Amino acid sequence: MANFVRKLWEARLIENYNEVSVLGLMTTAPASMTAEAIVFNKLATGAIKDYEGNIDWSDVDTVPVTMLFDFKKYFADKVGDIEAAQTNIELIDAFAAAQMAQMSELVDTYAYAKFAAGAGTKVADKAITAAEDMYDAIVDLGVEMGKKKVPVSNRYVVIGWDALGMLEKDKRFTHNPDVLANGIVNGQKINGMTIVVSANAPANTILGIHKGAVGFGTQINELEGMRLQNAFADGVRGLTVAGAVVLNADGVAATTYTIQ
């Protein structure tokens, strides 16, 4: 369709996705992406050595980690008159917000499941019998990450809404916390980890992540406007692809819990 302004629709879709997804903030961005694959650079550094009068140089290089996109979802919707819609930015925004809210839920579920499966530290199931137990479980997870020498900065912990509810009953945590649109619990950290709440986190799981330990990327591969053959309307369809990978298993920790 000649009058379809792809850049306009794509920009609104991407902006609305970024407003509701935290993955881009808490993961390593890809070095490059093609239509079919995604590439991350993993840094390989030299060892620290004893000085005995001579210098032995080590190579510092990046090791590419390449994977095919294994998340692929599309939307295909009637929008009436595309040309008229393109003169109404509020209409396009409403469309983009609705589509990306659904897409972000699917992408988040996919990525968190991959991170949890690839966690290098898996703590035994925790029995939560009192509000304080949830806070303590998160502290313990952070301790395990510390034992693996995971950097203190850029640590996140992903929890479900039931876990956040337990935290709110704990005197050590803020009551009625401010949850941002992307799931970050504003201004709240436990054991140095920024709290992220998501309905798409693995069930009954506390997931600790260091930004440098996981990679994630997503893009809209196809976005088209067309006149529908079986309806008196125009249509817009798009294909979203994504890839998520654990780059350093030591930087990811997970524990399951049972609320009793």
Regions found by a protein language model. Name each.
Residues 2-25, 29-49, 58-79, 86, ...:
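Sequence/fold signature of self-assembling virion shell proteins
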Residues 17, 51, 74, 110-112, ...:
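Sequence-level detector for tyrosine residue identity
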Residues 1-2, 117:
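Intrinsic low-complexity, intrinsically disordered segments enriched in polar/basic residues
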Residues 79-81, 161:
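Residues immediately flanking
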Residues 53-55:
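Glycine-rich loop at the start of a catalytic domain that most often binds anionic cofactors/ligands
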Residues 119-188:
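Extended, solvent-exposed, turn-rich assembly/linker loops in the middle of proteins
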Residues 82-148, 255-260:
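Alpha-helical scaffold segments that mediate packing/assembly in large oligomeric complexes
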